[in-house]
Design a protein with these regions (language model features):
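Glycine-rich oxoanion-binding loops at beta->alpha junctions
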Residues: 1
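Conserved thiamine diphosphate
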Residues: 4-129, 133
């Protein structure tokens, strides 16, 4: 189905829990999307360890490592809903595979500045300092 969409000049946005999008489907993502550098976007929800009542079987940290090692795969882990919206638009505009990683729980908004602009591969300086680097 993905190939049918691509050959008709459309591209799929697919979504699943991170545990399944990256874990269970890793070989298919690597071989069928990553290696041929297809224009497919993967939205992975419930990433991390805060998945609520879904429990340990649905917790996923290794998705970052799995997706980052695929050549050409862009991995985006938005920090809040403002960045998540901007990241989806950036993924749409990017030609090639993208893995968008979303948590389950609500998080505080930190990207509410008027000059905020999301760019793939660039970080945001929230506050200058000398004591800690993150």
């Amino acid at each position: 189905m993905i190939y049918n969409l691509l050959f008709n000049y459309q591209f799929p946005f697919i979504s699943s829990f991170a545990m399944f999008a990256a874990g269970r489907n890793y070989e298919q993502v690597r071989n069928s999307i990553g290696y041929p550098h297809l224009n497919v976007k993967i939205g992975a929800t419930h990433a991390g360890i805060s998945v609520g009542e879904d429990g340990a079987t649905h917790q996923c940290l290794e998705d970052l490592a799995l997706m980052r090692e695929i050549p050409g795969m862009v991995v985006i882990n938005p920090s809040d809903d403002v960045e998540a919206r901007a990241a989806v638009h950036a993924a749409y505009d990017h030609v090639g595979p993208v893995y968008l990683r979303f948590g389950r729980l609500a998080v505080p908004v930190i990207n509410d500045r008027e000059d905020y602009k999301f760019e793939i591969g660039k970080g945001i300086v929230l506050r200058e300092g000398k004591d800690v680097t993150i």
